[in-house]
From Swiss-Prot:
Name by which UniProt lists this protein: Spindle and centriole-associated protein 1
InterPro entries: SPICE1
Coiled-coil regions listed in the entry: 325-437, 725-751
Subunit comment: Interacts with CEP120.
GO cellular component: centriole; centrosome; cytoplasm; spindle
Region span, Disordered: 164-200, 300-328, 789-834
Record PTM Phosphothreonine, positions in chain: 235
GO annotation, biological process: cell division; metaphase chromosome alignment; mitotic spindle assembly; regulation of centriole replication
S-adenosyl-L-methionine in keyword set: no
Compositionally biased spans, kind Basic residues: 300-311
Localization (cell): Cytoplasm, Cytoskeleton, Microtubule organizing center, Centrosome, Centriole; Cytoplasm, Cytoskeleton, Spindle
Compositionally skewed regions (Polar residues) per UniProt: 314-328, 794-828
Length: 855
């Protein structure tokens, strides 16, 4: 056996193997079948390629390039001379003041935005729902129940989110940025000085800007612009970046503050070319990554030192292509936004009517900031003005509402007052109608009462005897007209009384039994007493206590109110004068006429004196037992001052112009008063003699008789010796004279009816002596001399022309007066009232004439 190794694998000498040749199979090329599918649709377009290229580019190249340039400038400034170091420090502090504070503020706002976004993610999202629920009719709670916020929100607000955490700057990050920004100790010292200088106040910065650094700032801006121009000439512009996806654009809509912050970090006005704003949006979305890359670059100084040639190449090639265009695009976006704000402000100013300010030319970041701040100030001012105007409108509305409420209250009050006045007016009209009905009934009853009143029926026999005696006198005398003394009641009264009998009267009258031998009261009145009357003054009666005697008698007749008490002064005077008339001699006609004139005036005066003049009127009658001359003198002396006061009234308001007429009128009125008193005394004594059995009357008449009898026995003892023959002659003479006076008075009345047509003013206080009478004018003509006593006052017209004139004047004045007849209850004696007192009473109270109106 052999131990030699034999190489079995080696080639055999002399033996050669031929390799096997494989045959290639020829492949048959098939043609492209377009009918199956077209893959060119899925091929990327040039726009997609550009977009993919921009997506994969680094987003921090511009920021890194700007920081590298800043470091290069710092090294360059550090190598310069020391005297220029201070200038460069100041220049850098100005740049830091402009840019760094704004960067810090934007960083804080960005942090706060992220913190708020993180806080919102802690809570569940809620959506507003609108349930289709029918609410119960009586339920006070709404259909949607509002749930309270969960407890986690309050806990989060108290613990996590603090007010200072939103606006404070993170000190650690700021410290790392400032500590790693330099390459050596000099750079650290420079950064510290810049940080210390950047903390200056804004006011100091503005002051330095305006006073010291204006030239430095202008030089700085010119240097920067020259560098930008040279870089733009060396490198062509880069390709624009494509648009981002829709999701990134939606995310960018909520990052407006971050976009503005990044735009302000770029250098202003580096080029005039435009660039799409998608780069800015992408930078905002990757702001966290940019900061991390920036910190990594600052933390590697060795790497930064080794890459100096690369850095120079970046500044020379690609960076110079991208940076100017992108910064210019950002400035254009900012400028466009500022212009939009200005345009909106202009539209708002035009809409509100304010002064429109033009667009301000903005150069660089300072111009943008100034325009933005000015727009913000204007907007705040406009908001303030609108708020003030709104407050004024609210105050004006409140005032108008208050005024409206006051006006509504006034309208309500006026409406209530009008309704109340309507009710009062209706009630007043009802009372007026009732009063008119009652007044008509009382007038009818009054007419019936005048016809049936037995007041002076006891004068019938005296009138019959007087008519019998005067009938013969009148037939014998040539001057006396034929006038019947017994004038009956006018036809008007008779018709009215006939139409209303006693059973149909609304007011029952007090029936007094008349004696069978007495006649009616109204038949004793002459026709002129019943003449129609017109009210010349409006009714102004203030008191119900002051009535004329005839009104009192008529009121007692219709049972309305008892009559006031009447003093028996006139009857006492008349009965006292009867004995004086017996004692006085009847010698001559002149003496009789003077006495009758005097007595007429005195009697007319005495009947109007009243209670105040009662003592004055009784004083002259005590002296009537003396001779005629003494009585004339005493009466004239006592009456002269009284007549001097009433001369204008007796003369119907006409003032006397001469002293002679004044004296003559005093004498005439004195004589008339004396004659009237004598006539009254004789008439009273004649009644006592003719009717010895006594007259029917009230207690006042009997009292007057007793007083007059006692006065006669004490004062006139000589009167018992007179013969009845002389008395009858005297009575007949007096009756004749009274009939003559009555006839003349009737003639005067007829003349007034026929001739006088001129009417006096209705409100005239002065009574005219002769008043016209027409049937259509309804004038009141009343005679103050009644039918029973008028003949005694007629002697004044038969003796002397002076006395005749006075009698006519007095009769005319009394016939035109509107005062009623003065009557005493039960006695039937009527005396005229004082014209002066009558006119004053008309002026004060007003007076209704009680005579009948002729239609």
């Amino acid at each position: 056996m052999s131990f030699v190794r034999v190489n079995r694998c080696g080639p055999r000498v002399g033996v050669r193997k031929t390799p096997k040749v494989k045959k290639k199979k020829t492949s048959v090329k098939q043609e492209w079948d377009n009918t199956v599918t077209d893959l060119t649709v899925h091929r990327a377009t040039p726009e997609d390629l550009v977009r993919r290229h921009e997506i994969h580019k680094s987003k921090n190249r511009a920021l890194v390039h700007w920081e590298l340039q800043e470091k290069a400038l710092k090294r360059k400034w550090r190598k310069q001379k020391p005297e220029t170091l201070n200038l460069e420090k100041r220049r850098l502090s100005i740049m830091k003041e402009i840019l760094s504070d704004q960067y810090q503020m934007q960083d804080v706002l960005e942090k706060s935005d992220h913190l708020i976004a993180a806080a919102k993610e802690l809570f569940p999202r809620r959506r507003t729902g609108f349930p289709n629920i029918t609410v119960a009719p009586d339920s006070s709670q709404g259909p949607i129940v509002v749930n309270q916020d969960p407890i986690t929100q309050s806990i989060f607000n108290e613990s996590v989110i603090e007010p200072q955490a939103l606006n404070d700057v993170d000190g650690e990050e700021e410290g790392t940025v400032t500590s790693q920004s330099g390459e050596s100790e000099n750079e650290n010292e420079l950064d510290n000085s810049l940080n210390s200088q950047s903390n200056t106040n804004t006011d100091r910065f503005l002051q330095q800007l305006t006073e010291e650094n204006s030239e430095l700032i202008s030089k700085l801006w010119t240097d920067i612009q020259q560098k930008i121009v040279t870089q733009s000439q060396i490198t062509p512009p880069g390709t624009p970046s494509s648009a981002l996806s829709s999701g990134e654009q939606r995310a960018a809509l909520n990052a407006t503050n971050a976009v503005n912050r990044f735009q302000t970090r770029l250098q202003p006005e580096e080029s005039t070319e435009t660039l799409d704003s998608s780069y800015v949006v992408g930078h905002v979305l990757n702001s966290r990554k940019q900061k991390q890359l920036l910190n990594k670059v600052k933390r590697k100084p060795n790497l930064h030192a080794l890459s100096k040639p690369k850095k120079n190449m970046l500044s020379g090639s690609t960076t110079s292509a991208d940076l100017p265009n992108r910064t210019n695009s950002n400035l254009d976006v900012l400028k466009h936004m500022i212009h939009e704000v200005e345009h909106e402000m202009e539209e708002y100013e035009r809409w509100t009517g304010r002064e429109v300010k033009g667009l301000q030319s903005s150069q660089g970041l300072t111009g943008f900031t100034l325009s933005l701040v000015s727009s913000l100030c204007r907007l705040v001012r406009y908001l303030k003005e609108s708020e003030i105007q709104l407050r004024k409108e609210v105050e004006t509305r409140q005032q108008l509402e208050q005024v409206l409420g006051d006006h509504r209250e006034l309208i309500d009050a006026l409406t209530a007052e009008i309704l109340r006045l309507r009710e009062e007016n209706a009630a007043t009209q009802a009372r007026l109608r009732q009063y008119m009905v009652t007044t008509d009934e009382q007038l009818i009853s009054l007419t019936h009462a005048i016809k049936n009143c037995p007041v002076i029926n006891n004068r019938q026999e005296i009138q019959a005897s007087e008519s019998g005696a005067t009938g013969t006198r009148v037939m014998d005398s040539p001057e006396g007209p034929v006038v019947n003394a017994n004038v009956s009641v006018p036809l008007m009264f008779r018709e009215e009384v006939a139409e209303f009998p006693q059973e149909q009267l609304p007011v029952k009258l007090s029936q007094v039994p008349d004696p069978p031998d007495k006649m009616n009261l109204a038949k004793n009145f002459p026709a002129h007493i019943f003449e129609p009357a017109v009210l010349l003054t409006p009714p102004r009666q203030k008191s119900n206590l002051k009535f004329s005697p005839l009104q009192d008698v008529l009121r007692r007749t219709v049972q309305t109110r008892p009559a006031p008490r009447l003093l028996p002064t006139v009857e006492i005077i008349e009965k006292e004068q009867n004995w004086e008339e017996k004692t006085l001699p009847i010698d001559t006609d002149s003496q009789n006429s003077s006495e009758e004139n005097r007595l007429f005036t005195q009697r007319w005066r005495v009947s109007h004196m009243g209670e105040d003049l009662e003592n004055k009127t009784q004083a002259p009658f005590v002296n009537l037992s003396q001779p005629l001359c003494s009585s004339h003198s005493n009466t004239q002396q006592s009456r002269s001052p009284t007549f001097s006061e009433e001369l204008p009234v007796l003369g119907d308001g006409q003032q006397l112009r001469t002293n002679e007429s004044l004296i003559q009128r005093k004498d005439i009125m004195t004589r008339i008063a004396d004659l009237t008193l004598q006539n009254s005394a004789i008439k009273a004594h004649m009644n006592n003699i003719i009717d010895p059995r006594g007259e029917q009357g009230d207690g006042l008449r009997e009292l007057n008789k007793q007083e007059s009898a006692s006065d006669m026995t004490s004062t006139f003892p000589v009167a018992q010796s007179l013969t009845p023959g002389s008395m009858e002659e005297r009575i007949a003479e007096l009756n004749r004279q009274s009939m003559e006076a009555r006839g003349k008075l009737l003639q005067l009345i007829e003349q007034q009816k026929l001739v006088g047509l001129n009417l006096s003013p209705p409100m005239s206080p002065v009574q005219l002596p002769l008043r016209a009478w027409t049937e259509g004018a309804k004038r009141t003509i009343e005679v103050s001399i009644p039918g029973a006593e008028a003949p005694e006052s007629s002697k004044c017209s038969t003796v002397s022309p002076v006395s005749e004139i006075n009698t006519r004047r007095s009769s005319g004045a009394t016939s035109n007066s509107c005062s009623p007849l003065n009557a005493t209850s039960g006695s039937g004696r009527f005396t005229p009232l004082n014209p002066r007192a009558k006119i004053e009473k008309q002026n004060e109270e007003g007076w209704f004439a009680l005579s009948t109106h002729v239609s």
